[in-house]
Regions:
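N-terminal alpha/beta PP-like core and its mobile active-site loop of ThDP/TPP-dependent enzymes
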Residues: 2-385, 432, 436, 441
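Active-site diphosphate/adenylate-binding microenvironment
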Residues: 43-54, 65-75, 269, 398-462
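Short coil/turn segments at secondary-structure boundaries
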Residues: 202-205, 389, 446-449
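Internal, active-site/partner-interface "lid" segment
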Residues: 383-403
Length: 462
């Protein structure tokens, strides 16, 4: 009897999946009359359908007894051609692959693991997802909701939802304790992974007893769609004019470009000219203005360049655009010793108010800069193209930096006592790889953490 039920369930799922595949999506299948708005399903199938509505079609998986039911649903929907699964050897690798996919192509993916150690491996890998602000779903098998005692593969403690607490420290998380809570969980997930300014990992914990739970007459229209909207420009209240006056008064303007400024290249370029400022960039936005741009002083901070750190140390006004002020960028609060005022443009309130004596402009970076540039044009007292002492000083430092790097590229090897011969230096090796990647046009570089990462910041010339 049980085998008959399982076989019938698989057949029903496959038929439904084929209808969706043929129609091109859930909404199209409903519109064609081939799929009812209300279906009898299980939580795991409804979850896969909900993720499909959010255009999640790729799953990187290391399955186990904690994810048996979700794995069965994925098997059926892959057979129908609706989704694709990729079995990988390690959960951390799955996490990194999903992160890279979102970063390079913008495509969303989900990482699926079993209960306990596997989930912990993927959780460790999600640090990259969180650090780089990229939206990825994580589906972890979880202990049952019946509290029959600690699960031997999870945290051995008599307390509820310990993995939920753990995951909530890295990003947003939700335990599917009740099948009908699925729409709420998926809306929170959608708002997290498609956040317009800073995405992140979203952890869905799937208790083993709720994964196969039936959902009778479930309304597919409850599955959330629609990405969260972006902000407009920061509210005025006279602050644009106030900021423009502060910029016009300053003698040495530096613009710190963080990840939130990656889509504001033209507006930043115009601002630099109007403000007679120079830019220092975070590694995330290498290329937001070209390396060759005369006002681009490249990276600054504890792993910065000669010219970037000079601009950071000498500036009297800081304009921060989409920056989080991580320890490496502002040298653990020792940077900007001569800055007297900060204009902080950010979509996040906490980041926008990070520094004291700051004028916070909370809004979209590009839209806010457009309004600030309009205000600056009214305040401008220096003719465009004029080369100030500040500009010439920074240009000279960039020339010094380029010469410093050239010396090391011209001597690409050093004698190494361990290897007993000449060994390629790290800057030279990275330079060769970066130049080759750029020459190919479509090759992406990923840098490991630590000193490789630091030299990568300094070598790349996007």
């Amino acid at each position: 009897m049980e085998e008959d039920f399982v076989s019938q369930l698989a057949a029903t799922r496959l038929e439904r999946a084929k209808v969706i595949a043929a129609a091109g999506g859930i909404d199209e299948a409903i519109a064609s009359g081939q799929l009812s708005e209300r279906i009898d399903t299980t939580l795991s199938e409804a979850l896969v359908l909900g993720l499909l509505q959010q255009d999640v079609r790729r799953y990187l998986v290391v399955l186990g007894h904690g994810s048996t039911e979700i794995g069965e649903v994925l098997r059926v929907y892959e057979e129908a051609g609706v989704i694709q699964t990729y079995a990988v050897r390690h959960e951390t690798a799955a996490s990194h692959a999903a992160t890279a996919l979102r970063w390079v192509t913008g495509e969303k993916a989900a990482v699926v693991t079993s209960i306990g150690p596997g989930a912990m491996h993927a959780f460790a890998g999600s640090l990259a997802t969180a650090s780089d602000g990229l939206g990825v779903y994580y589906l972890f098998g979880d202990e049952t909701t019946e509290d029959e005692g600690p699960n031997m593969q999870q945290i051995p403690k008599h307390e509820q939802h310990l993995f939920l607490k753990l995951c909530s420290t890295m990003g947003n998380a939700y335990c599917l304790h009740t099948p009908l809570s699925l729409p709420t969980a998926l809306r929170r997930g959608l708002n997290t992974i498609d956040h317009p300014y800073r995405g992140g990992p979203f952890f869905l914990l799937l208790p083993m007893n709720t994964q196969p739970a039936s959902m009778k007459d479930f309304n597919l229209q409850e599955l959330p769609v629609g990405t969260p909207p972006s902000l407009g420009p920061a509210q005025d209240d006279g602050r644009y004019q106030q900021a423009a006056k502060a910029v016009a008064k300053a003698k040495r303007v530096v613009v710190r470009i963080g990840g939130g400024g990656r889509d504001a290249g033209p507006q930043i370029d115009q601002f630099l000219e109007l403000a007679d400022g120079v830019a220092i960039t975070s590694p995330l936005v290498s290329g937001v203005i070209p390396y060759e741009h005369p006002r681009n002083m490249t990276v600054a901070g504890s792993k910065g360049s000669i010219c970037g750190n000079h601009a950071q140390d000498r500036a009297d006004l800081l304009v921060a655009i989409g920056s989080r002020f991580v320890c490496q960028s502002d040298s653990s609060r020792t940077a900007y010793p001569n800055v007297e005022q900060v204009i902080n443009i950010n979509a996040d309130l906490e980041a926008a108010t990070h520094y004291g004596n700051a004028m916070a402009l909370v809004g979209d970076a590009a839209a806010t800069l457009e309004k600030l540039n309009e205000a600056l044009e009214q305040e401008q007292t220096v003719a465009p193209g004029t080369q100030s002492d500040w500009f010439r000083e920074c240009v000279a430092k960039k020339q010094e930096w380029d010469s410093f790097k050239a010396e090391r590229y011209n001597q690409p090897t050093l004698q190494d006592s361990v290897w007993g011969g000449q060994v390629l230096t790290q800057p030279a090796a990275i330079k060769v790889a970066a130049d080759w990647a750029r020459s190919q046009g479509d090759v992406v570089n990923f840098f490991d953490a630590g000193d490789v990462q630091a030299n990568g910041f300094q070598v790349v010339e996007d």
